[in-house]
């Protein structure tokens, strides 16, 4: 069995994650999952432009989410089909962190596991290849928890002076797993 990107970064802390979170991050190959999601719109015109640049939802929605994963030992591609928007990102390892490529942005996350919760802490960001200064770096809440066969997620990103750029929360039902 190949160790997932998240297992590699977390090491022994991986065992502290809720079983549903562990199961989700051990999925390999091409799989699809279904669940429910709610998205919030960006706070300002500038925040909407930035949301467009990083391909995150720009309209408030509530409804089904269809999630497609293509995971190998070196890279994971996540495609989130929201009710009115599709968002794709690619995750790889970078110096002991997870690097997520999302449109014109590269996000560098440290991972933390505590009491079943996975927290992704943004440590660095590059926009169009240019490093973002710490004072301008977004405040990001990115958490996953598990409840039975559901992976719950909560993502919220705000940029100083622009306000909320992206926000969505919901769950994926692990019993809906389909091999693609």
Question: What residue ranges belong to the model's regions?
Answer:
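C-terminal structured interaction module
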Residues: 153-180
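Soluble ligand-binding/transfer domains with enclosed cavities or grooves
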Residues: 2-147, 151-157, 168
